[in-house]
Amino acid sequence: PKKEVVFFAIGFETTAPVHMMALKEAQRRKLSNFSLLTSLFTVPPAIDAILSDPGSKVDGFLTAGHVCAITGNSAYHKLAEQYKTPMVVTGFEPVDLLYGIYRCLLQLEG
């Protein structure tokens, strides 16, 4: 191969496995012209940045259950306590999201 292929791997922690699959496939095929340029982030620091802004008007967060199934939810507990902001782990189905909103509202009222 005469041209370099650069795969821009951008996203949050849930996208990392897909990027690694691409890299493993390139290695399996012995592609010497495949590179991975990553810009991967984790969600808790992004939430921290939002909540540390004095102008932030966010009242609560619905956090992704599929992420917490891998990483756990302790980082969200710390942020919720630090900023006194509800963070509820939910799925993506409508009933899950509605229940998450309900749980956020209960915490805000409490």
Predicted region positions:
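A conserved active-site cap/scaffold subdomain adjacent to cofactor or substrate pockets
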Residues: G55-G110
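Class I S-adenosyl-L-methionine
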Residues: P1-V6
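Phosphate/pyrophosphate-binding betaalpha-module
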Residues: F8, F12-A75
